């Protein structure tokens, strides 16, 4: 390749990335996921689009997509809090294993019938599209305000279910190549090997990488690069010795993100950019790889297969997988059933049969791509609507304008949070000494206009003041309440109810105040303990219980315990003024 061709390649690549970024603003206007925009740019630049670029290198696409997926999972793992495992780990694992198997099997049976294929080839299509996609789920759920049980379950499931789909895909390809028609014990052993090696190597490699980052003294900009390089080494090593590289790098990210690590914010900041670049690059390449005209002949059976998977296979898999977990309400199960988002992973897996030279491999690829398009357009674009209908949304916690890590020592967890005070903030007009700051936090600076003030305890806050507060991540909820808008009936109260009660209020006192009947309920029990008992011991903000004809909603959690409960009366039956216990 001469210099001129290299320059053309660089220019076209940069142009496609820039076009994807510029067109991403259309996502909100059109009501479609931003990843669909990236995919559309690739398709427009491809062989059937205005660009006319002919790209048929499946191996290169496979390499690029795997690299991008690894980076996305490493970033997603670092941002997943292990505290959510309290309510989400077991159900997510059930969905990632049993759920994928059921979805793949039912989808495969339908594929064999719709496309008149041998059973094993139909099951191969089911395996290819059997898992949800981490890149899509992390992207679409970010900032949507889902309750912890639902949001964390979907995120952990998407980060851990790819090994099952990949294992089923590879196993079925090997069976088709060998002419086998039955599963043996080695099938189960191989599955255990994939999960076992991936998990162990992710934990061990993540721990070693953490120690290296915390002990090594280099330029700040090199720590994120070291984290990425280490994660990719773990990803590659796990795959080379028979484990799941996808699971290994996700577990590695989990460990790095939940332990004190040097230059945490620098790493996360760079990871954010790398994850976006990976998503753009991956969906651009997959868009270039697709020939839209080849989808038309299979459109009707592929659409029927998509609807079968979305409306029957996925819901049945979810309901069966979540049977042991009583804490999931029906509406939460229905929402999880609907948000079975497919993305790049099915397309990556669909490249396997092409590289293996299987019969009907191009059909498998086109069907997988069609299902991904339907999933992104149908499920992705209706996520917010479905969350509202299923009542799994909770009011988002107020967040600072910006936050920056303070590298006080090697594994410092100190941060600086910046808040701008608008007229609706209830702390406006208060003196600094009157603010009930969380223990261990300090106001480091106060800006008024362009001036840095030297405040005292008597300094009163004004509209448009900018406060710089030093604290820890766990202080954000309290700081958010302190520097947030004053609560109104149109905001938190509309969701949580008419009154907000303290979690340690006794049921007997509440019953006496509101004229409720305790029945067989222990009056000495606190309302917080009562709520936890009613939702099978793992409550999350947004959980609702009907008792005495009233709606009780978990309004705040702390260290796994219910701290505040919202009480909502039926319309037209609200006694007295609002009370705060």
From Swiss-Prot:
Pfam families: CorC_HlyC (PF03471), Na_H_Exchanger (PF00999), TrkA_C (PF02080). One of its GO terms (cellular component) is plasma membrane. SMART domains: CorC_HlyC. Keywords: Antiport, Cell inner membrane, Cell membrane, Ion transport, Membrane, Potassium, Potassium transport, Transmembrane, Transmembrane helix, Transport. Its main location: membrane. GO terms for biological process: cell volume homeostasis. It catalyses: K(+)(in) + H(+)(out) = K(+)(out) + H(+)(in). The chain crosses the membrane at residues 3-23, 34-54, 58-78, 87-107, 109-129, 165-185, 187-207, 231-251, 280-300, 303-323, 334-354, 367-387. One of its GO terms (molecular function) is potassium:proton antiporter activity. SUPFAM superfamilies: FAD-binding/transporter-associated domain-like, TrkA C-terminal domain-like. Signal peptide: none annotated. Belongs to the monovalent cation:proton antiporter 1 (CPA1) transporter (TC 2.A.36) family. NhaP2 subfamily. PANTHER family: K(+)_H(+) ANTIPORTER NHAP2, NA(+)/H(+) ANTIPORTER 1. This is K(+)/H(+) antiporter NhaP2. The gene is nhaP2.
């Amino acid at each position: 390749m001469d210099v001129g061709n290299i320059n053309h390649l660089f220019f076209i690549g940069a142009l496609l990335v820039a076009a994807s970024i510029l067109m991403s603003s259309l996502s909100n206007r059109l009501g479609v996921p931003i990843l669909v925009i990236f995919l559309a740019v690739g398709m427009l630049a491809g062989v059937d689009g205005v660009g006319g670029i002919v790209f048929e290198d499946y191996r290169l696409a496979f390499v690029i997509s795997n690299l991008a997926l690894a980076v996305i999972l490493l970033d997603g793992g670092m941002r997943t809090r292990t505290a959510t495992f309290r309510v989400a780990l077991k159900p997510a694992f059930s969905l990632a294993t049993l759920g994928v198997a059921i979805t793949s099997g039912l989808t495969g049976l339908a594929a064999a019938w719709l496309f008149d294929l041998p059973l094993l080839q139909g099951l191969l299509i089911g395996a290819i599209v059997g898992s949800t996609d981490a890149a899509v789920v992390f992207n679409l759920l970010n900032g949507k305000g889902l309750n912890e049980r639902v949001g964390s379950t979907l995120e952990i499931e998407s980060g851990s279910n790819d090994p099952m789909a990949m294992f089923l895909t590879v196993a079925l390809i090997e069976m088709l190549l060998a002419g086998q028609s039955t599963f043996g014990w080695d099938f189960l052993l191989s599955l255990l090997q994939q999960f076992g090696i991936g998990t162990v190597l992710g934990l061990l490699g993540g721990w070693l990488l953490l120690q290296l980052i915390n002990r090594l003294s280099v330029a700040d900009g090199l720590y994120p690069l070291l984290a990425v390089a280490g994660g990719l080494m773990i990803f590659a090593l796990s795959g080379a010795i028979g484990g799941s590289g996808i699971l290994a790098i996700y577990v590695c990210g989990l460990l790095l993100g939940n332990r004190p690590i040097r230059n945490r914010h620098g790493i996360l900041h760079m990871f954010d950019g790398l994850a976006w670049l990976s998503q753009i690059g991956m969906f651009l390449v997959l868009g270039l790889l697709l020939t839209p005209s080849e989808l038309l002949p299979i459109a009707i059976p592929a659409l029927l297969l998509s609807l079968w998977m979305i409306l029957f296979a996925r819901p049945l898999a979810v309901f069966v997988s979540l049977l042991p977990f009583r804490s999931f309400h029906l509406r939460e199960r229905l929402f999880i059933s609907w948000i079975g988002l497919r993305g790049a992973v099915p397309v990556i897996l669909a490249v396997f049969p092409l590289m293996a030279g299987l019969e009907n491999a191009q059909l498998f690829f086109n069907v997988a791509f069609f299902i991904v398009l339907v999933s992104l357009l149908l499920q992705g674009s209706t996520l917010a609507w479905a969350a509202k209908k299923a009542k799994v949304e909770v009011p988002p916690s107020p967040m600072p304008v910006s936050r920056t890590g303070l590298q006080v020592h090697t594994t410092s967890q100190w941060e600086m949070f910046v808040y701008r005070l608008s007229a609706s903030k209830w702390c406006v007009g208060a003196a600094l000494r009157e603010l009930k700051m969380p223990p261990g936090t300090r106001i480091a600076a106060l800006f008024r206009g362009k001036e840095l003030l030297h405040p005292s305890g008597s300094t009163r806050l004004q509209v448009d003041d900018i406060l710089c507060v030093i604290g820890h991540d766990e202080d954000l909820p309290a700081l958010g309440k302190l520097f947030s808008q004053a609560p109104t009936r149109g905001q938190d109260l509309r969701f949580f109810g008419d009154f907000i009660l303290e979690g340690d209020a006794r049921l007997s006192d509440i019953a006496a105040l509101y004229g409720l009947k305790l029945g067989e309920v222990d009056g000495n029990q606190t309302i917080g303990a009562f709520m936890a008992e009613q939702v099978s011991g793992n409550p999350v903000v947004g959980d609702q219980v009907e008792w005495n004809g009233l709606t009780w909603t978990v309004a705040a959690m702390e260290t796994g315990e219910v701290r505040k409960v919202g009480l909502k009366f039926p319309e037209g039956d609200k006694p007295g003024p609002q009370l705060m216990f």
